[in-house]
């Protein structure tokens, strides 16, 4: 009996030691992205880039000789309590070395992950998130925004829309946006800049996420006959239904849907029906024809893996993983968070399009190595027409007047 008990104890100790040894051979990383709910489509787009980068690293020896292990958490609709639960689970319990979150909120994520020191990479695109960071930069030093804020993206949209090789029939603008900080920031910036050049905001509608019946708004739009509609809702389904209903009785109007053009579900659902629609992808790699050989190799591999062109978030979060891995390798310890964060802030990362760096707010503003890419849907796919900064016509694409404009 004693022998059996002793043997059981020895086996338990051996299993525990083996488990610890296995754990020591991996580096955990957190991926809190929406897997259910209204943001699940864009969450899947982010995950494709994250997984592609992690698979590449693991196939070539991992980071510092250790394989990366992904721990996921469903961040759903970024409710503050869910975001806090994710941070406590990933950083508090799983002790991850880094977190790759994609769109993660509009400031609640900064508060949640700022309690810890592991580098946290987000795509909030929100001035509200930056404002939280600015309340205590030393505390939130581990928070990295991978794209420009809403106002920065809206300025780029304004530049693109006012430089189309197209003569607007009038100077009437309609803006439709969501009621979150993202939608309001875009609306305010677009309206202010168009008013400066003599345009009139003929109608502005703020709506909640989940709005899919556009009949009343569109009936008013058809009476106004605006030269331009800017529609800004960072969720695929609302963009799909708006375009479908607009095209039932279109006006001679350029339709811009901003960030909403780039979730993969939008072009997958609409196909060639969306031809002529304009939008933008912040922090993008132009495709299907990339600007250089390194970028083209990446595009070709992505398309080979996922059987479609690049959606929003995939390339920039592939890059976030590679930037963190490079910093960890240079420091020599993925868990020396102070040193890894210092390396990222001081050195940035050499990506497919050049050196990318964060500013004093840890925001990756629009820059040549991480440009805003402006697209038009053509033949059911995204075709780049401008990159910014500086705003430049893309050499492998051109604007085509939408078929519904007579």
Predicted regions and their residues:
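Bacterial N-terminal signal peptides
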Residues: 8-18
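Extracytoplasmic "Venus flytrap"
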Residues: 26-51, 73-80, 103, 176-185, ...
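Extracellular/periplasmic Venus flytrap/periplasmic-binding protein
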Residues: 81, 85, 141-249, 287-293, ...
């Amino acid at each position: 009996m004693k022998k059996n008990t002793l043997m059981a104890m020895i086996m338990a100790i051996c299993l525990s030691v083996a488990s610890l040894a296995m754990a020591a051979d991996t580096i955990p990383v957190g991926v809190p992205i929406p897997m259910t709910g209204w943001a699940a489509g864009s969450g899947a787009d982010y995950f494709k880039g994250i997984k592609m980068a992690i698979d590449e690293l693991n196939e070539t020896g991992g980071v510092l000789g250790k394989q990366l292990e992904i721990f996921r958490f469903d961040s759903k609709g970024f409710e503050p309590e869910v975001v806090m639960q994710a941070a406590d689970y990933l950083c508090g319990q799983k002790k991850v070395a880094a977190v790759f979150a994609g769109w993660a909120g509009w400031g609640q994520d900064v508060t949640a992950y700022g309690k810890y020191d592991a580098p946290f990479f987000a795509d909030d695109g929100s001035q509200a998130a930056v404002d939280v960071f600015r309340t205590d930069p030393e505390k939130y030093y581990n928070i990295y925004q991978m794209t420009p804020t809403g106002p920065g993206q809206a300025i780029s949209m304004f530049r693109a829309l006012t430089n189309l090789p197209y003569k607007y029939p009038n100077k009437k603008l309609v803006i439709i946006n969501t009621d979150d900080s993202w939608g309001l920031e875009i609306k305010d910036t677009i309206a202010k800049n168009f008013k400066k050049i003599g345009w009139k905001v003929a109608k502005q509608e703020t709506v909640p996420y989940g709005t899919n019946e556009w009949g009343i708004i569109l009936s008013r739009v058809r009476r106004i006959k605006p030269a331009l509609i800017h529609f800004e809702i960072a969720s695929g389904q609302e963009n799909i239904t708006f375009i479908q209903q607009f095209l039932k009785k279109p006006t001679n109007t350029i339709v811009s849907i901003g960030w909403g053009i780039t979730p993969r579900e939008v072009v997958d659902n609409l196909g060639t029906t969306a031809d002529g629609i304009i939008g933008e992808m912040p922090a993008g790699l132009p495709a299907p024809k990339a600007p250089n050989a390194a970028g083209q190799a990446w595009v070709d591999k992505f398309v080979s893996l996922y059987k479609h062109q690049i959606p929003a978030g995939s390339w920039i979060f592939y890059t976030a993983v590679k930037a963190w891995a490079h910093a960890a390798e240079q420091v020599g310890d993925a868990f020396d968070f102070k040193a890894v964060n210092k390396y990222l802030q001081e050195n940035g990362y050499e990506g497919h399009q050049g050196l990318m760096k964060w500013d004093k707010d840890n925001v990756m503003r629009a820059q040549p190595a991480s440009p805003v890419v402006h697209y038009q849907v053509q033949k059911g796919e995204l075709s780049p027409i401008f990159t910014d900064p500086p705003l430049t016509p893309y050499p492998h694409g051109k604007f085509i007047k939408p078929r519904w404009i007579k």
